[in-house]
């Protein structure tokens, strides 16, 4: 399933909100976001289970929970409006659902930036099979 997700991200390219999320991550961390976080820990990328492994993985857990609260659109599809103003990410647009998705991504990008010191390369390409502890509630 993870291979399919990587292929989907590559096919999306510069279209869709995943590239927008990657741009936000890049602005807040200075690293290429999507590839650095897509399969990090137990929660970054498609799906998630178990307990977050560190603060970076917790950013993804909270992001997943945020997406779970979005109503009216698919959080992984569509394009939202946002801009960077004085180093801050500002979500805009008239569609309340896409604006909510943007806010989820904005908060996650900020979280990644604030927790870069917890990023551990051993959790890159981490297998969900190794996430065995009971999952937390959102």
Curated annotation (Swiss-Prot):
Binds 1 Ca(2+) ion. InterPro entries: PLipase_A2, PLipase_A2_Asp_AS, PLipase_A2_dom, PLipase_A2_dom_sf, PLipase_A2_His_AS. GO terms for biological process: arachidonate secretion; lipid catabolic process; phospholipid metabolic process. The keyword Oxidoreductase does not apply. Its main location: secreted. Gene3D superfamilies: Phospholipase A2 domain. Its EC number is 3.1.1.4. Keywords: Calcium, Disulfide bond, Hydrolase, Lipid degradation, Lipid metabolism, Metal-binding, Secreted, Signal. SMART domains: PA2c (SM00085). It is an enzyme of class 3 (hydrolase). Belongs to the phospholipase A2 family. Group II subfamily. D49 sub-subfamily. This is Acidic phospholipase A2 ammodytin I1.
């Amino acid at each position: 399933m993870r291979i399919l997700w990587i292929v989907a991200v590559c096919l999306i390219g510069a279209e869709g909100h995943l590239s927008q999320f990657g741009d936000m991550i890049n602005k807040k961390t200075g690293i290429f976001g999507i590839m650095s976080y897509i399969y990090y820990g137990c929660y970054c990328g498609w799906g998630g289970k178990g307990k977050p492994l560190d603060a970076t993985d917790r950013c993804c857990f909270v992001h997943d929970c945020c997406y779970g609260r979005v109503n009216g659109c698919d959080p992984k599809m569509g394009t939202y409006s946002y801009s960077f103003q004085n180093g801050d990410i500002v979500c805009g647009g008239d569609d309340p659902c896409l604006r909510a998705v943007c806010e989820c991504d904005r908060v996650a990008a900020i979280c990644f930036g604030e927790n870069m010191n917890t990023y551990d390369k051993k959790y890159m390409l981490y297998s969900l099979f190794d996430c065995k502890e009971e999952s937390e509630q959102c």
